[in-house]
Amino acid sequence: TRRVLTMQRLPGLHLNEWLLTEPDQAARDQAGQLLFDAFFHCTFVLHRLQADPHPGNYLFMPDGRLGLLDFGCTHALDADFCQALSALWSAQLRDPADHSAMHQAYRDLGLIGPNLNEQDFCQQLLPAMAERHAWQKLPFTVAVYDFAQHPPYPRPSAEHQRQALRHLQSLPEALPYVDRAYLGLIQLLKTLGARVRTANPWIR
């Protein structure tokens, strides 16, 4: 055969076991930084997402490195999808938010059709998505973010849900994988109580 599967044994502890060793804040921050950087590097550079963000898929190694386990669930990301995702998140961060760029990114992602013009997008869809956008961008609004303080994922009102369903046309195949992995990352960082430098080349 031209392909041979190999395995490598990694020393280290899973998250809960590692936390029982009472790592200091610097160690928690370092581990959180590695998790954060790995997610964005995989998404925007490798275009290949480890789509199962279960804590058991990470090892905290004695030398401070992060071990990634179990690549049985990965998802390939299209370069155009990643570019549109980067544009959307970046547009949210501008002060004020760049609604025109957000509208275009929503179209590029296939979330809305050509019939939803920018004015209706801003007046009807964006208010329904505002809480979700605010939650998503919060870590990127400061240079170092304390994930221990990150709020729970917002639950939209029934009216906002109706508005979103009325205007959202379809869901890109890759988006649920990215959202699930991002939510998993946030939960890991919150459990760690990590303070992370969130500046990166893709969301700015």
Task: List each language-model region with its residue ranges.
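Short amphipathic alpha-helical surface micro-motifs
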Residues: 41, 50, 157-160
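Catalytic-loop of the protein kinase fold
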Residues: 45-55
